[in-house]
UniProtKB/Swiss-Prot annotation:
Major localization class: mitochondrion
Coiled-coil annotated spans: 354-385, 448-583
Keywords: Coiled coil, Mitochondrion, Ribonucleoprotein, Signal, Sporulation
GO cellular component: mitochondrion; ribonucleoprotein complex
Signal peptide feature range: 1-23
Region (Disordered): 507-592
Compositionally biased residues, Basic and acidic residues: 507-580
Location relative to the cell: Mitochondrion
Family: Belongs to the SHE10 family.
Example of a GO biological process term: sporulation resulting in formation of a cellular spore
Protein name: Outer spore wall assembly protein SHE10
Oligomeric and partner information: Component of the mitochondria-localized RNase mitochondrial RNA-processing (RNase MRP) composed of one single RNA encoded by the NME1 gene and at least 31 proteins. Absent in the nucleus-localized RNase MRP (NuMRP).
Length: 592
């Protein structure tokens, strides 16, 4: 199985390589190439087998091919075209420049250096030769100029001499022809019959000229009119034999070519009308192409703007959209309904332009059909008039010959008379039958059909190309919308994730803040409790200090009192001692 897959892959690569190298348009047109390779290019082409199966297999034509073509155009071809555009873009942006730089740097530069050396070494040599060649041509021209002038002078003199001789010969020939013609026409009594009516002349003057020349040739076989008049032993029917032959041939020829004359006049009329009509239609088709091209450019521009960027206006807070390059501001945000409306607008304009061309075709075809019917009716009337005149006039001529023959009591003329009348009746019936055929004749409008086929092919090609391009653009738009929607969905999901993360962060911060506040509150409570305890301690210490102070003051007062008492006692003691020393009695208080 693996070998089979490798074999198929190798065979496919080999076939496509041969097709790429040999099966191009130039190679196919070259008849000197190998027949087997041309056959290979033909039989390896999928379009050949597709056309072959469409032509020879009804089931493939009606069932398989439409479904396969529709699915291919819908699911495969747009992606192939997009891949080709991407590959061409890669080639133009990177590969082409890289290849050109490589070729220019590695090969062209070397060849240019070698060529410059060759040019410098041979330039002087070729310059000398070109100067010598110019001098030689100039000398040759001077030598041949006089020789050519002499030849022209001799040739002009010879031409003038020959022209004079030819003019004299032509005048003599014209005189002889006029003399012979007048002699022949005066020798016959049926000149009116041989001269065609104006109606028959308008159908085809060439047939009359042929018939007249044939009559003159028949007259020439009799040498002169004198010989005809010197044969009294011939009957009237025998004398009118040449006239009968000429008349039968004229009527038979013109009758047989009546339909051909009609087709020829219609063809000339169509060729005359189709040329300006073709110019008008070409202008309409070119206008049609330009309109479609403008609509396609508008659609392509909007499809390219699907892949856009957005920003928020800092002043208004409005979302502003920019093209992919980020420089051009978009008038609106490109949506699927908007692109669908553009596709519908293109289809409606395409249909309107196509209807305009179709209406023009229909009106012009109706006008041409009306004029062709008039030409047909005119030809029928002309043929009827010509047939009536030719039949009636010749019947009178035959009746006159019949009377003259009866006057001479010629019994031998009865068989000739029967034969000529039988041929006359047969030809009359043929003229009537051809008239009926001319009335029912289906006019050939080959130029018109060919022109309409070309126009239809042109319109079909435009329609096909436009539909294929619309399919490609529709697929491209769908891909861009899918990519943008996927990107927007990812951005939306990313925003949701970021928003969720932000909310979680805010919630976490809030929780941390609450915890910190609670901690701060606890710390504040602890601090307050410490402050209260410290205050109570300080108050207690102050109270204790106050009590100690009071105790100290009381102690000091007690000490002061004791000191005061001691002092007083000391004073009393001193007074006592002083009194004792002075021998005075103690004070009364002390005595008490």
């Amino acid at each position: 199985m693996r070998f089979f897959k490798r074999f198929l892959l190798t065979l496919t690569v080999f076939i496509y390589t041969l097709r790429y190298l040999h099966c191009n348009a130039d190679y196919a047109l070259d008849e000197s190439n190998c027949t087997c390779l041309r056959n290979f290019c033909q039989y390896s082409n999928a379009n050949y087998w597709n056309d072959y199966l469409i032509e020879h297999n009804e089931y493939y034509k009606t069932v398989i091919n439409p479904v396969a073509t529709e699915n291919y155009n819908l699911y495969i071809k747009p992606y192939c075209l997009i891949a080709r555009e991407k590959s061409n873009l890669y080639y133009k942006l990177y590969l082409e420049e890289h290849v050109n730089n490589t070729l220019n740097n590695k090969y062209v530069a070397r060849v240019a250096e070698e060529f410059l050396v060759f040019k410098e070494s041979h330039c002087h040599y070729w310059k000398n030769h070109s100067v010598k060649y110019h001098d030689w041509i100039k000398l040759l021209h001077e030598k041949t100029e006089n020789y050519i002038k002499n030849i022209k002078v001799k040739f002009n003199s010879l031409h003038d001499n020959l022209k004079g001789q030819f003019d004299e010969m032509k005048q003599d020939i014209h005189k002889n022809v006029k003399t012979l013609t007048s002699t022949l026409y005066t020798s016959t009594s049926t000149e009116e019959t041989l001269v065609p009516s104006p109606a028959s002349h308008s159908i085809d003057t060439k047939v009359e000229e042929v018939s007249g020349s044939h009559l003159i040739d028949n007259k020439k076989t009799d040498n002169t009119a004198d010989e005809i008049q010197t044969t009294p032993e011939l009957s009237e029917w025998e004398l009118a034999q040449d006239e009968f032959n000429a008349w039968f041939k004229l009527v038979d020829t013109k009758s047989s070519k009546a339909c051909k004359f009609l087709d020829q006049e219609v063809e000339d009329y169509l060729n005359e009308k189709i040329e300006p009509w073709e110019l008008e239609l070409n202008e309409k088709i070119n206008h049609f192409r330009k309109e479609i091209h403008l609509q396609f450019n508008k659609l392509v521009k909007n499809i390219e703007d699907i892949d856009c960027t957005s920003e928020v206006d800092g002043e208004t807070g409005e979302v502003i959209y920019f093209a992919k390059n980020g420089e051009t501001q978009l008038s609106q945000y490109i949506t699927r309904p908007f692109i669908s409306s553009l596709f519908k607008e293109i289809e409606s304009k395409f249909q309107a332009l196509e209807n305009n061309i179709s209406t023009n075709l229909t009106n012009t075809i109706d006008e041409l059909d009306k004029n062709i019917q008039e030409i047909h009716e005119h030809h029928v009337e002309l043929y009827e008039e010509w047939g009536d005149i030719m039949i009636s006039e010749w019947s009178k001529r035959m009746a006159y010959i019949e009377v003259v023959a009866a006057h001479y009591d010629s019994e031998s003329d009865e068989d000739s008379s029967q034969e000529y009348w039988r041929n006359f009746l047969k030809l009359k019936k043929k003229v009537i039958s051809i008239r009926d055929n001319l009335v029912e004749h289906h006019i050939k409008v080959t130029p018109l059909n060919q022109f309409l086929a070309n126009v239809q092919n042109e319109l079909n090609n435009i329609t096909k190309e436009s539909n294929e391009y619309l399919l490609v653009l529709r697929a491209k738009a769908n891909l861009l919308f899918d990519e943008r929607e996927k990107r927007e969905e990812e951005e939306h999901n990313q925003k949701i994730i970021l928003q969720r993360m932000e909310n979680e962060r805010i919630q976490s911060e809030q929780e941390e803040r609450i915890k910190s506040l609670q901690k701060e509150e606890e710390e504040a409570e602890k601090l307050l409790e410490k402050e209260i305890q410290e205050k109570a301690r300080k108050q207690e210490e102050a109270r204790k200090q106050e009590e100690a102070r009071k105790q100290e003051e009381a102690r000091k007062q007690e000490e002061a009192r004791k000191q005061e008492e001691a002092r007083k006692q000391e004073e009393v003691r001193k007074q006592e001692e002083a009194r004792k020393q002075m021998g005075s009695p103690p004070p009364p208080q002390q005595q008490q």
